[in-house]
Amino acid sequence: MGSSNSVCVGIDDVAIHFPRLYMDMKDFADLRGEDYGKLNKGLGLKAMSIPDVHEDTATMGANAVMKLIDRNGLNPKNIGRMYLGTESALDGAKPTATYIVDMLTQRYSERYGADCFRNCDVVDMTFACIGAVDAMHNTLDWVARSTDEDERIGIVIFSDNAKYALESAGEYTQGAGGGAILIRRNPRLLEIPDIIGVSTTPVHDFFKPRREVSVKSIISNVMTLAQEAGQSIKKGIVERMIRHLPASTVRKSVSYTHLRAHETASD
């Protein structure tokens, strides 16, 4: 990459997986009072994919990789790395890519052996919207070191389950899905030259997932559901219920900031 003596590397194939459940953007626009033309023609939004109860970042990524392997007749033992770009990791320490590899191993172990992915390097890359781009740059560099005796094959996975607060400004941009990109020498789809510009600057972004939930929000949601079911709820009942909860319950269920605010109000 980058000179006349460089090897040609790039994208050889792409596979995509979306959940079967979705919400039509016309229905969403009607529900939220949004301009459907803006969402559909302005932003190109047609539907909002929704993970089923058995789906998450790992399963969507695994399904995409499975399509890629089956369509190209790849032997898992020849796949040297699978790097995942995601903002929706399942674990704070264990890479979500390891969950993907575990599922793929279960699928292909009977044909290729229980250790078919044993020598495959996996890692998660998190950097807002460009995690998978960084994963691809790293994989391109790695594949570029291929030789005739050592043909390197890498897969870049991208998978996310984007969720925003109800009725928030970004709600209509949420959705879920995964994909897998096959990186190898002499690609059929797209050669990517070694001409890459880099610019990094710290900016504020949103943080997820939320690590705390207030007792008040839990009880309030339950009361709202009860009202929708036709129950009569007395005014101020949420606050009265919180006051009668054991102190240990409050400490375990709210963040330190919420607890201090409650103590100050009580004083």
Where are these predicted regions, by residue range?
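Single conserved hydrophobic/aromatic residue that forms the stacking wall/gate
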Residues: H258-D267
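Active-site-proximal alpha-helical scaffold in enzymes
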Residues: V123-E151, T173-Q174, I181-P187
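Condensing-enzyme catalytic core mediating Claisen C-C bond formation in acyl metabolism
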Residues: M1-H54, E171-Y256
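Acidic, glycine-rich active-site loops and adjacent beta-strand->loop/helix elements
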Residues: G85-D91, T126-G131, F158-K163, N186
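Structural signature of cysteine-dependent C-C bond-forming condensing enzymes
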Residues: D70-G80, R107-D121, V143-I157, S266
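A glycine- and small-aliphatic-rich helix-loop capping segment at beta-alpha/alpha-beta transitions
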Residues: P95-E110, L140-R145, G170-G175
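Membrane helical hairpin/interfacial module
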Residues: P76-K94, I100
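Phosphate/pyrophosphate-binding loops at sites that engage ATP/ADP/AMP, CoA/4′-phosphopantetheine
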Residues: A64-I79, T249-L259
